[in-house]
Amino acid sequence: MRNSGESVGVTGGKIAEFYDEEGNKYPPEVVTVLGAGGLSSTPEDLCRFGDSFAPGGMNILSDSSLKDVLKEQPTPFSSLLKGDALLDAFGWDYALLPAYRENGYQVLGKSGGTLFYSTNLQILPQERLAVAVTYSGQAGAAKATHRIMEALMKDKGLPGPKPVSPVKPPEPQPIPDEFLKLAGFYVNTQEAVRMIFDNESHTLNVYSLASPSEDEEAKENKEKPILSLVHNGGLFHDFATGYRYYFLTGEKTVYLVMEEVPQYGADIPMYQKIDPVEKPESLSVVMDGRFWLIRNASPFAQLPDDLLVKSEEYGDLPGYVKFFGVNRVETPDFGAIAATGFRDQCNIQLFKKDGAIRLKAIQFVYSSEDIAGTLVPGENTIVIGSEGENEWRKVEQGGIMSIEKPANGRVIIFPRRQVEKVYDSIIDSSEISVPGGSLVFLAGEPGDSFSIIVR
């Protein structure tokens, strides 16, 4: 492997630039991949790495380690699924794909990516085939490796996956009582929903839950199902996509599982059932409609998705709050993970610093929006404190804003308390028209001084 290890920023060399959806070019990404078990590498080197798992390749691992890393290692949960499971191998996203297994081949794959890049590696050890794809931006790298691998196998005269034939939509059938009792509240990685069965149309309808702080239009939109599934033979069918779902009830909780996910052929849980709280707790501050301002972000944060976060409560599901995901309120200062069957979830913890409320989620620390000072007409000077915490300011009335910042400082503006930014100092000019109600994020080193003129 000739181009792996230290980043291009250290060793020098060419990289693909990153552009956002509006065509703005960002500076090279700053990210640590080694701590997550990642590689700073090129597609060519990834293919060499993939070949190290093949018989006859330049093996890095011992024979016994290779045997372990290539075999399926299912969890007890996997045995409850009707079909195969993903993430059932040591370090791989999958160690077998059913469509290849039918022809006696093992195909392994691993995705990787950052905010600026998408990467996928797929290997077929028996034939010493490895495919790696890296895109600048968020793209379907996994789909690309699948298609390239299929083409390679075809070129070599090897039997590949059989083409998927279209299936006639099944007729709706009455829903058995054993399913009807599974109606209720469910969560996924992002939100809570309500599942309701319709006996007349033989459908399962999934609705997003509204929060009291939402406007009437948003509440009306949530009266329409985000998913409508027709029952037939114990499965629930989405005619629009061709996807099929089933309920898994053999665990301590209930899951709605997608059967044979396209491209992978494996079953993936999509929703987990949760129970309403008989005696719901509340957090020590009102969470619904509250905006939280990050205090410990680096000036080099690549994309501002986590800088400004809106928390919500559910009117029909007291005792739960939504921050990054859904949390069940356990005490006035703590919310536990509700979607315990899914990855990338976190608890939330409230605490006070200097008399003001704060929220911690994973490594991120937030203050409530009321800590933001107000920018006045004329010149405003903002200095980063001795602890290096981010500063925030709000704009009461709209106007033209001129910004002067230190060399490594960062300024991002969010319009009217919306989480989509309108200005970012690393790609935009120093002057901008700002609507009233905007929030201004400032990051830098302790003692850094920013000058903002509002007129």
Regions found by a protein language model. Give the residues of each.
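Glycine-/small-residue-rich beta-strand-loop submotif within the FAD-binding core of flavoenzymes
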Residues: 18-28
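Short, mixed-charge, low-aromatic patches
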Residues: 2-9, 24-25, 101-106
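Active-site helix/loop module of the DD-peptidase/beta-lactamase fold
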Residues: 1-18, 61
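Catalytic loop of the DD-peptidase/beta-lactamase superfamily, centered on the K-T-G motif
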Residues: 27-455
